[in-house]
Amino acid sequence: MSLIKLPILIDPHTHCRDFEQNNKETFETATRAALAGGYGYVADMPNHSHPIVDKRTLGELKDLAEKQIVTDLGIYLGVTPQSVSEAEKNFRECEGEVRGLKIYMGETTGGYIVDSDDDLDKIFRTWESNKPILVHTEDKSLVKALELAEKYKRNLYVCHVSRKDELELIDKFRQKRKNNIWVEVTPHHLFLSDKMSISPFGQMKPPLSSDEDKEALWMAVIKGEIDTIGTDHAPHTREEKMGIKPPSGVPGLETTLVLLLRAEKEGKISREKIIELTHNNPIKIFNLNKEKYDRAEVVLVEEEFLIEENNLKTKCGWTPFKEMRVSHKIVEVNFDGKIGYKDGEILAVSGSGKIV
Ligand code: DOR
Ligand code: ZN
Ligand code: ZN
């Protein structure tokens, strides 16, 4: 029985839910799912039932999360059309406590889209920080984000790139080298495509793309054009997904590492690349404590099995990767000097994670 060890994973893109959406997930269940999937750090997206946009909402999130988390947690500040007028004050008061600023430049869960040119210009101008501006973009809004980041020399982190034409566009802007542009890809865009009939459980934003796009994403991974893998873990209940208007989003924290290791076995990605995308690069981009996360590790055993829903720790209890064959099982996760997960059980105590 051969064991393998990897440094613990860092997820720059998780939706922990909680608040009025604690039927979908809570900080506790999200971070338990994270630990079971080999993650020691997740960064929470601000599109909560009430968005995290200022000192007050940031404080509420911290109060709610700190007693629950079993991994470390990062926070992003959000900005909505309603909060733009207070941008200067909010950014000044919150910049030190967050890992970056998230802007929804496309319609998605929560409905916090900012699409006025004036608002967007003001946001990019006012965020005078080296910490990245993260963008959810679809179609035309990607050009806008790239142009504004270049205009104000801001560090830009493009979430969930899913298509070949987006990669080409980003490449053009990168050649000018005026600012940092980091690119994230999700496990669902790497491992699923629009040919698979898994709707509504495969409905997310941006939607699953063609096999050609998927291949372009893998090529970009190999060529070094992708910086991180963000799970975009976005749980919704089974009932909601099966309703007449299913919400967009899929869970991903518990399946990403094993899927990547299967891809390694198939010769699609190297072990070094997996570590770069899930550990080294997120630590660098978000300026995290390298020593702490370098010491933490995930132990896996080589064993073929099918991904099953009844073993999941996420509260939503389903996965779009159901019944996919994988080649490794996570047996132990060591985090912060302790065994946090072992053989299906979470041993880490609620509240043991830190907000950083
Ligand atoms: O599919 C998605 N779900 N895409 C997003 O950008 C947001 C997320 C969510 O919060 O449900
Ligand atoms: Zn998004
Ligand atoms: Zn997201």
Residue spans of the language-model regions?
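A glycine-rich helix N-cap at a beta->alpha junction
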Residues: 63-79
